[in-house]
């Protein structure tokens, strides 16, 4: 028994080394003074300073931050409302729509990316043809040209972020006392007041977790962004890929370290919130059981 336990521990250690040793090496060499990736020449921060003078990186960072924040906000609103709608359905319709909701998460990113790209190209072509038709008929030409860009990138991120918000909010809905909203309305609150002042506060942990997950997924996405951003827009993941294709620069180590740190901090926040939520729920159930036993 002890021998099997020891082998299991060694196996787990080897797995963790295999997973995290490359990331650790990347982080260490992001502070290496030499461009040589095999020789340590001393500690430096100038690769991080160089990022501040790289216009392509700065623009990609602005695009990444803008898309991630906007996508997280919109997906949080849509996902919360959709979760409430799913929860209000009967069992079979709910199971059907939950299955549909799970498709973007289980589907390969490249399939989702190509599908969204074809959809956006189709609609942009229709809109451009409509603008051309209106111009031919009226002589008034609108100075617009619909194409893949920031808007299509944002719509794509909203599309794959929303299911994660739904899955984060649904557990809170299952724990919600259905009588709270009715009790608030019996006491004189309008349905909207009951929703905003009674229901939403109960859903806040799931909503916040869903928003953080959505933001993390957007910051980290490459494949779907690559197909839906077009030629004029690039996020950080795409910029790192472009730099790596040209040559492996120490700046890639620096920007990858920054991305890893951002994602890791957000994941820690999510896990801490989940643990605290579970502890609070356990305390609440324990208090109810104690009161019931009296």
Q: Model regions: which residues?
A:
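Transmembrane-helix boundary motif in ABC transporter permease subunits
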Residues: 1-5, 70-101, 114, 118-121, ...
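Interhelical loop and adjacent transmembrane-helix boundary motif
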Residues: 2-4, 48-56, 219-276
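C-terminal transmembrane helix and the adjacent membrane-cytosol boundary/short C-terminal tail
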Residues: 2-10, 86, 134, 170-185, ...
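Periplasmic/extracellular loop-to-transmembrane helix junction in inner-membrane transport proteins
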Residues: 4, 35-71, 245-246
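Transmembrane alpha-helices
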Residues: 11, 16-23, 103, 107, ...
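Short membrane-interfacial helix/loop motifs at transmembrane-helix boundaries
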Residues: 21-55, 226-231, 283
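Membrane-interfacial helix termini and adjacent extracytoplasmic/periplasmic loops
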Residues: 36-41, 45-46, 50, 110-158, ...
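Hydrophobic alpha-helical transmembrane segments of multipass integral membrane proteins
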Residues: 58, 62, 66-78, 82, ...
């Amino acid at each position: 028994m002890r021998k099997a336990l020891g082998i299991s521990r060694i196996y787990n250690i080897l797995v963790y080394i295999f997973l995290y040793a490359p990331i650790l090496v990347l982080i260490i060499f992001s502070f290496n003074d030499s461009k040589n990736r095999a020789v340590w020449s001393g500690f430096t921060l100038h690769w991080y300073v160089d990022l501040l003078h790289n216009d392509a990186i700065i623009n990609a960072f602005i695009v990444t931050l803008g898309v991630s924040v906007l996508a997280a906000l919109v997906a949080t609103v849509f996902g919360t409302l959709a979760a409430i709608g799913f929860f209000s359905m009967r069992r079979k319709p709910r199971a059907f729509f939950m299955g549909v909701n799970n498709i973007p998460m289980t589907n390969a990113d490249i399939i989702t990316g190509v599908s969204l790209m074809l959809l956006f190209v189709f609609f942009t072509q229709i809109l451009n043809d409509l603008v051309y038709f209106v111009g031919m008929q009226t002589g008034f030409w609108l100075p617009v040209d619909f194409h893949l860009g920031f808007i299509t990138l944002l719509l794509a991120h909203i599309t794959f972020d929303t299911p994660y918000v739904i899955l984060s909010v649904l557990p809170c809905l299952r724990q919600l006392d259905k009588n709270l909203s009715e009790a608030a309305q019996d006491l004189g609150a309008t349905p909207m007041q009951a929703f905003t002042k009674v229901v939403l506060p109960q859903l806040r942990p799931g909503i916040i977790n869903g928003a953080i997950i959505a933001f993390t997924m957007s910051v980290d996405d490459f494949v779907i962004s690559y197909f839906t951003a077009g030629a004029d827009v690039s996020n950080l993941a795409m910029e790192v890929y472009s730099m790596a294709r040209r040559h492996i620069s120490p700046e890639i180590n620096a920007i990858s370290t920054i991305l890893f740190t951002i994602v890791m901090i957000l994941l820690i926040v999510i896990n801490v919130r989940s643990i605290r939520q579970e502890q609070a729920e356990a305390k609440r159930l324990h208090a109810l059981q104690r009161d019931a036993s009296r």
